[in-house]
Amino acid sequence: MTCSITELAKKLISIPSVSPKDLGCQDIIIKRLCAIGFDIKRVNVNDTKNFWAFRGTGKTLTFAGHTDVVPIGQDKDWQTDPFQPVIRSGYLFGRGSADMKGALAAMITAAERFVNKFPNHKGRLSFLITSDEESSAVDGTIKIVEYLMSKRDMIDYCIVGEPSSTNIVGDVIKNGRRGSITANITIYGIQGHIAYPDLADNPIHKGLPVILKILSIKLDSGNDFFLPSSINIANIHAGNGFNNVIPGSLFVQFNIRFSSEVSEKHIQSQIVNILNSNDINYSIEWLFSGKPFITKKGLLIDTVIQSIFYFNKKKPILSTSGGTSDGRFIALMGSEVVELGLVNNTIHKVNECVKISDLKLLSCMYEDIMKNLLS
């Protein structure tokens, strides 16, 4: 079993599928799923490859994931070729090993074993796979969700294979994520010589008090599932590097991660009210990444906890920390969504790697969840 998982992971890692490119990863996965009786629906959009695979009918358990990876960074910083997977000291090295081609290999091999043992399983087992998770995410999972919703074909339970674990596989699972919205604000002044400030209008001087007011907004106090919402500056820029020029504009980018206690409209109104109450000329662009979502205790969480406890003899921590994930799109269907994946301490880093034993453990957990929900 370990060999099968490892070999599949190595095949996927060897393909340089930097987002949103797939470059053949999904063909490998689809071939294996077809061999065990899955029907396939491709939902490709622009440069993004997506597919929906399903087997059986009834209550639906979906495993969701992505074949794309982030860029490698500086090649010289890698100890090995990031797209030539290497096993060393019990670890599999390569870009995507932890995020999340290793988890994809664990899912597929788990499904193969499950179908072999339970060829007439109850319910429907399915896969939702995209190559646009690490970049814009506009042509990926959301397009499959829209396709399914147009057919009134809903997902009941979904396991997202994102690397949720901290120290050992299954020590942390994500039962929700915060929402995310970005405000790109440009404050306008009048460019001029810095020795003649009376002939110019410095947007930095005007903008700093406004920025501090925005940062001081208290949106909420959080709740049982989410920490308080946070506002942070992601980027700020003014001027052209010359020390004798008052710039004509100031750009500042705020990112807000928000709990279920507030809406994106409330956040927007709070920020716009501050901007309008000050004597400034500004423009603002909003980029909305997703609403917060939460899966409360129910059949899926109970089943996932049960499977993790069976192997680890310890229950996982339920968390909503971290960035956004494609779970936010699947949650739009009213699905119960849980993220369970590999250890995340090397994701997006040089020398990304995963324990071979963790691949085996995760695959066993996935198979046990299938068995408990569908056999």
Curated annotation (Swiss-Prot):
Which chemical reaction does it catalyze?
Answer: N-succinyl-(2S,6S)-2,6-diaminopimelate + H2O = (2S,6S)-2,6-diaminopimelate + succinate
The domain of life is Bacteria
Query: What family does this chain come from, according to its entry?
Result: Belongs to the peptidase M20A family. DapE subfamily.
List the EC numbers from the record.
Answer: 3.5.1.18
Q: Per its UniProt record, what Pfam families does this chain match?
A: M20_dimer (PF07687), Peptidase_M20 (PF01546)
Which InterPro entries does the UniProt record give? ArgE/DapE_CS, Bact_exopeptidase_dim_dom, DapE_proteobac, Peptidase_M20, Peptidase_M20_dimer, Peptidase_M20A
Which residues of the sequence carry a binding annotation for Zn(2+) 2?
Answer: D99, E134, H348
For this UniProt record, the keywords arranged alphabetically read as follows:
Amino-acid biosynthesis, Cobalt, Diaminopimelate biosynthesis, Hydrolase, Lysine biosynthesis, Metal-binding, Zinc
Name of the protein: Succinyl-diaminopimelate desuccinylase
The organism is Buchnera aphidicola subsp. Acyrthosiphon pisum (strain APS)
Q: How is the cofactor bound?
A: Binds 2 Zn(2+) or Co(2+) ions per subunit.
* PROSITE patterns in alphabetical order: ARGE_DAPE_CPG2_2
Q: Which GO MF terms does the UniProt record name?
A: acetylornithine deacetylase activity; cobalt ion binding; succinyl-diaminopimelate desuccinylase activity; zinc ion binding
The active site lies at D68, E133 (proton acceptor)
Q: Record-annotated residues binding Zn(2+) 1? A: H66, D99, E162
- Per UniProt, the enzyme's principal EC class comes to hydrolase
Q: In which pathway does it act?
A: Amino-acid biosynthesis; L-lysine biosynthesis via DAP pathway; LL-2,6-diaminopimelate from (S)-tetrahydrodipicolinate (succinylase route): step 3/3
Cofactor names from the entry are: Zn(2+); Co(2+)
Function recorded in the entry: Catalyzes the hydrolysis of N-succinyl-L,L-diaminopimelic acid (SDAP), forming succinate and LL-2,6-diaminopimelate (DAP), an intermediate involved in the bacterial biosynthesis of lysine and meso-diaminopimelic acid, an essential component of bacterial cell walls.
Mention one GO biological process in which this protein takes part, according to its record. lysine biosynthetic process via diaminopimelate
Record's subunit section: Homodimer.
